[in-house]
């Protein structure tokens, strides 16, 4: 897949006139135009990283809008295996992309992009959508429980179904959100119940260790960041998202949306991503 280019050519007319009297006649003015071009402005590739208990399809509405607007979009799988491993895999994927990148993370995806982008000169902007924006040593657990209001701050056995990983540590199982909790956590009443049921059915598990692994040095100290905050978020309370966004000096918008704002408010999310993309030019 090749990068899309937008070329802008500017013409500067340089008129060279010659006026000569020949008997009773007058010579006509002659004009010529020289073409001058500026370097092409390259739209960045937008990399959309999904969060826990989801897959790349959670970005479908946003991806379609970005593609309509001329952006190359990719939604690589997030392994949901732990911050370090997930960041390493994303970093390897980013290495295959030529040209500037806008890196977008939803929810747990924010943990991953913050670690994966560190030192990557191709990543020109970070965009956090209802996401964790960690500093060094932060964990998903510590950020989730920092302020009241998260559904996931409850006793784990009331929120998650636990499935042992064959050959793995029994204390670190895969976690699935209970169907009875899924809608309350992710969608509120903004998504029809039948659609919530489908999302819950196809959820991908998050490894328990992903909740407690510490983040490394954050990329947002050197890469400008943007954020979208859903004010009805029941996973990461809006107050916590605001605090993290301020700490990262992110360009922030707040919208009336649940945790899945890219599903319920794809237009607002797309606009914020494109604002970040335009700022990279």
Regions found by a protein language model. Give the residues of each.
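Post-His helix in hydrolase/transferase enzymes
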Residues: 263-279
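Short beta-strand/loop motif that positions the catalytic acidic residue
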Residues: 221, 227-229
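Conserved loop-alpha-helix segment in the C-terminal half of the alpha/beta-hydrolase fold
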Residues: 230-257, 263, 276
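Active-site catalytic motif of lipid deacylating hydrolases and related acyltransferases
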Residues: 38-99
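Active-site nucleophile elbow and catalytic-triad environment of alpha/beta-hydrolase enzymes
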Residues: 198-219
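Flexible "cap/lid" loop of the alpha/beta hydrolase fold
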Residues: 122-123, 127-169, 207-210
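Secretory targeting and sorting signals
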Residues: 2-32
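Gly/Ala-rich beta-loop-alpha elbow adjacent to hydrolase catalytic centers
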Residues: 104-109, 113
């Amino acid at each position: 897949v090749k990068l899309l280019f937008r070329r802008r050519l500017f013409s500067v007319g340089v008129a060279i006139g010659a006026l000569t009297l020949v008997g009773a006649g007058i010579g006509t003015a002659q004009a010529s135009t020289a073409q001058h071009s500026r370097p092409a402005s390259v739209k960045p590739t937008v990399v959309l990283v999904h969060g826990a208990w989801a897959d790349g399809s959670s970005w479908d509405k946003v991806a379609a809008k970005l593609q309509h607007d001329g952006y190359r979009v990719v939604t690589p799988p997030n392994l949901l295996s732990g911050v370090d491993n997930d960041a390493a895999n994303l970093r390897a994927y980013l290495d295959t992309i030529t040209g500037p990148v806008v890196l977008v993370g939803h929810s747990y995806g924010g943990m991953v992009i913050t670690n994966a982008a560190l030192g990557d000169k191709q990543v020109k902007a970070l965009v956090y959508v209802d996401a964790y924006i960690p500093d060094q040593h932060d964990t998903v657990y510590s950020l989730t429980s920092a302020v009241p209001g998260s559904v996931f701050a409850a006793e784990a056995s009331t929120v998650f179904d636990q499935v042992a990983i064959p050959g793995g540590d029994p204390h670190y199982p895969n976690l699935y959100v209970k169907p009875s909790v899924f809608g309350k956590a992710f969608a509120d009443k903004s998504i029809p119940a039948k659609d919530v049921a489908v999302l819950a059915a196809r959820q991908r598990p998050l490894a328990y260790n992903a909740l407690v692994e510490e983040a490394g040095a954050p990329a947002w100290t050197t890469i400008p960041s943007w954020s979208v905050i859903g004010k009805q978020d029941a996973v990461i309370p809006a107050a916590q998202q605001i605090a993290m966004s301020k700490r990262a000096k992110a360009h922030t918008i707040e919208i009336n949306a649940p945790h899945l704002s890219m599903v319920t408010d794809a237009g607002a999310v797309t606009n914020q991503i494109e604002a970040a993309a335009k700022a990279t030019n």
